């Protein structure tokens, strides 16, 4: 599945929430640009872009379940949602694992070996 198809799937997942859609487009554009300027290899660039697209996948659930989108809730709820979302996206298992990890830690500060590819 191409990045554009992942984007289309995530926009559909967002069910017309223009705030969420605009945010994911902005974050994706920043991530894409930074990755290209850093001259990432193709696989790392793909992981970066898909993680950027999916990073707030848990926001709709968090709003419903907790009444807010607190970062810790997003991380907790986002990992299984991202894992399910990625099942039919045609990425390798290690790409999926990296993306799920990034979604589950995108509000966590600190150094991590897993942020290095």
Report each predicted region and the residues it spans.
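Generic alpha-helical secondary structure signal
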Residues: 1-8, 22, 42, 76, ...
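Active-site flanking loop/helix segments enriched in acidic
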Residues: 2-26, 58-69
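Short, mixed-charge, low-aromatic patches
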Residues: 3-9, 33-40, 55-61, 116
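Alpha-helical phosphate/pyrophosphate-handling elements in metalloenzyme active cores
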Residues: 15-48, 83-89
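Divalent metal-dependent catalytic cores for phosphoryl transfer on phosphate-bearing substrates
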Residues: 46-117
